[in-house]
């Protein structure tokens, strides 16, 4: 009896690292597949660290049939939930909640773009944009700051126009879509 228990203990020790690797892979599949599944429809930009991890996870999934099935099922469930929300008129709320819940992996694409542009302008431009678009306290602009201010403002207007056209084309709520763009913009401004 002791011999059998010893053999079982040895076998369990041999398979423990494999089980641990499978658990790690499963956790990564559960984390990344829904995010990547909604990149296009929710207009998400994945951060660099998550993008690298996702590529590594995809390579590992190719050799593990159980992980592959899980990835497929999660993608299907995520897309189904999105379609249900979209068809129920809740697309923006669904995407907003999803991005908030997965903020460690991704953010709204427009928020990421605005953050990139804001890092190149002065703080007075950032404060003026925050005041005029997001309701922050007033700020003064120097003559040199008007051009970058106008460029960022034009970028916002262009994104809002695009959101409006997409909403009209797809039969979505125009006000909700353009408001979401403004909220994404203000989220980037507030992180500064």
Describe the predicted segments one by one.
Residues 1-4:
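Positively charged n-region of N-terminal signal peptides that target proteins for export
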Residues 6-15:
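Hydrophobic helical h-region of N-terminal Sec-dependent signal peptides
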Residues 20-52, 112, 117-139:
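Immediate post-signal-peptide N-terminus of mature secreted/exported proteins
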Residues 50-121, 135-192:
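Compact alpha-helical subdomains of small soluble proteins
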